[in-house]
Curated annotation (Swiss-Prot):
Recorded GO CC terms: cytosolic large ribosomal subunit
InterPro entries the UniProt entry points to: Ribosomal_protein_uL29, Ribosomal_uL29, Ribosomal_uL29_sf
PANTHER family: 60S RIBOSOMAL PROTEIN L35/50S RIBOSOMAL PROTEIN L29, LARGE RIBOSOMAL SUBUNIT PROTEIN UL29C
Name of this protein: Large ribosomal subunit protein uL29
Record bears the keyword Flavoprotein: no
Species per Swiss-Prot/TrEMBL record: Mycoplasmopsis synoviae (strain 53) (Mycoplasma synoviae)
Amino acid sequence: MQFKEVKAKSVEELHKLVNDLKAELWTLEFRNSTGSLEQTHKIPQLRKDIARALTALKQKEMETK
């Protein structure tokens, strides 16, 4: 996910995106711990996507203040 795509979303969409990504990360980490996850490279990608979304969210919140 590119930062441009994330930055274009509204605050509500960013909150939903962060929650969805965190839920997906939890699922992948659980599957990884049980040994059933084959694509382990997705975990760091999701962490970076969450960081991008949180950064964009913080920027939007700072703009409105």
